[in-house]
């Protein structure tokens, strides 16, 4: 580069010495962001070759840095000449990926006041520019001046040096950083304009910032250039390191800030199964360790009796003779099958013939707690070898079951007399193989049964079957050790099928044949036979399997052999027909009574017949049954457990879980059902109560009582299957649809419920728990009564509960609460409360009054006022149901009749506005002497669990319960209570106080 004829003496004097001092400093550049260098003039040891205009302006000189490395710099010092315009243009700088570029300048500048004769021409600043281009402009074609370059800034020195600094060798190096951008072209030139300063440009460094390539949370993030806008974050997706994986819903990502710092990490990666985190990598689990899932951070040592021989194991294999159950997690220890049961003992009873077994648990459970027992029965020949044994077949019954026993006792029934049995009891657990029951881990016992009737069912011949007699024959038993044929007697027991086995008849004979007479035509009989020697051995023998014989009907009505039973039947039917005809003639016409002795002109005349065919059923008390499991099948259909599909849980029931599901019976469409299950571990009393509920529900057949579809008693768990009411409990349904139903629709729900209660009372059944929550609703607003799980001998429940609880006192009659007496009349009282709940859209009876307060108020004569839009005659019916004397309450037949007529009225009369629920009239003029439940506003707030608002009430002037009772919703809003839930609780409590005023001042309904 041309430098002219020679350097100006002042320029050398003021610039070279400070330059040497500046080079000794060595700049420091702190910061954690990564800087991508685009230009660093100090890194070039050759000439920079920048373009200078004019040639007498900027000049390139050489120097050394603090490490004695040569560097190239530019300087200018034409301070004694006016109107300086000296330009210096760098070479073309590619911007790379940077949009926001930083320019760092290091320079020294002479204080103009220290230069003699430079006043007016010397400057202490210079200008920096940049020019965006797509390509290099070239050294020979400078494009300086004009309006094309963009000015970066006017650069001034923080410190300038003087003549004295030169003598003291003081260092006055300035560093300035400027930002340019955003850039859009491929590169740019920098230009520096001198207007008369004495300046040395020591270093020019151009760079952009980027976020460093890093690994965080086991995710690798590449180097990322910062955005040009300072507030913009660049989202960068990370890549999981080797042997790691991310969450699909939250992949790893970070955000690169404008200053080159990583911000806002989201998500992370986890080491895959078989690997664990170590720093920023995932290393394999060593032998003896495993990791089953990425969700676990570290490898775990192998559980007991298992091992892992390789690196990166995801599970540990079990040692020989050990195994895991399919339901065991990989973290479970390996276990083995149990040893055989110990001390197997038996006892044999003769009548009935039964083999009872009991045993002790195995000495070695295999390390598991899920030990069960399985029985195998073999029938062996009397004198043959053990290998001649055959499976007992389906004839033999096992109680409680043959396999899956947790009990250590079992009974075998329906064994054959005169036979030899071998019974094996195997111990099993979760790792026992499918053939373990027949394996070596069993205990066995061999038993010979005594003599008896060794007949199969098909060995008893039906020789002759007539309308009134049956002839049977069989082969004579000749087993070894059995009574001889000359001394054998036979006992034949028979009874009508469907009758109790306790009401049977017997016939004895010495021959292997018998004819039983005096039977009923067209009747199915059950016959059983046993053989024994005469004497006390009869009771030790068992009867043969039962056979059934159907006697034919009479061939001709006029037969001389016609039985007396047929004659009685014909006479009875004839008498009933005659009696029916007479009663039809004596039928009377009468108008229904309205309770006042006067008829209604619009009432239609109805015909009442005093003669009824006796078809009414009587309720069978489940607790009067000896075995509810047998009794339930008299009224309920036994369902195959495979036909019931459970879909989702509806909540917890009294004895287990309540689910909804589907019932698929052969030849029928799939039916939605509700399924009540009996949970495992229930006591015997709970199991009996569960069966009693099914037995109770199975006796009812009414369109407004929940229908029993069937029961599952031969599977686990026990199930009660009922029809599914898809809209749930009535009280919840009404609360969710408040304001959507008119009074006529609400009243339309009541006649059906009254009809159901009439049906129950006529059967002699007392519900004991009638409430709106025990009424279920299905599509079409069809309501059905449920809740039949309360046993007939249940005592009255406790009546003292919290203010928010469901106290039985809200629905129970006074005699129930005082004496525990239940009757149809007490159900009438509860039905009155249900009518009130319906018309009040499921509101809690007596609002927030406690059970104790309700009992006292009812005893004092307080009765619920009519809900809004409640017809007055319906409220009068409620009051009739709430008569203190049970004998004065209406019967359900009367209630049903009254409600049915109300539903036919075009527009029932509403209650007066002054008597409607929650009267809005002010309470300021009413005496307010006492609140039995609360002594102060603080106590009232404590009962509501809202003590935190005591200061709010005091500050607003509500210091007494009288004042609180007069508050409105607007008053409450002025207290500054922001929680909607708390405001609703306070409004509910204020309403309860207002109700107390009604009670104390006689404003409620008194009876």
Curated annotation (Swiss-Prot):
Residues 340-452, 456-554 form the Fibronectin type-III domain. Residues 323-343, 467-486 are annotated as: Disordered. InterPro entries: Eph_TM, Ephrin_rcpt_lig-bd_dom, Ephrin_rcpt_TKs, FN3_dom, FN3_sf, Galactose-bd-like_sf, Ig-like_fold, Kinase-like_dom_sf. One of its GO terms (cellular component) is plasma membrane. Residues 35-216 form the Eph LBD domain. Residues 587-1007 are cytoplasmic. Residues 932-996 form the SAM domain. It is found in: Cell membrane. Residues 23-565 are extracellular. Its EC number is 2.7.10.1. PROSITE patterns: EGF_2, EPH_LBD, FN3, PROTEIN_KINASE_DOM, RECEPTOR_TYR_KIN_V_1, RECEPTOR_TYR_KIN_V_2, SAM_DOMAIN. Its main location: membrane. The keyword Protease does not apply. Glycans are attached at residues 311, 486. Residues 1-22 form the signal peptide. The keyword Cell inner membrane does not apply. Keywords: ATP-binding, Cell membrane, Glycoprotein, Kinase, Membrane, Nucleotide-binding, Receptor, Repeat, Signal, Transferase, Transmembrane, Transmembrane helix, Tyrosine-protein kinase. Residues 644-899 form the Protein kinase domain. Expressed in the cochlea, in the organ of Corti, spiral ganglion, and stria vascularis. Belongs to the protein kinase superfamily. Tyr protein kinase family. Ephrin receptor subfamily. Receptor for members of the ephrin-A family. Binds to EFNA3, EFNA4 and EFNA5. The protein kinase domain is predicted to be catalytically inactive. This is Ephrin type-A receptor 10. It comes from Mus musculus.
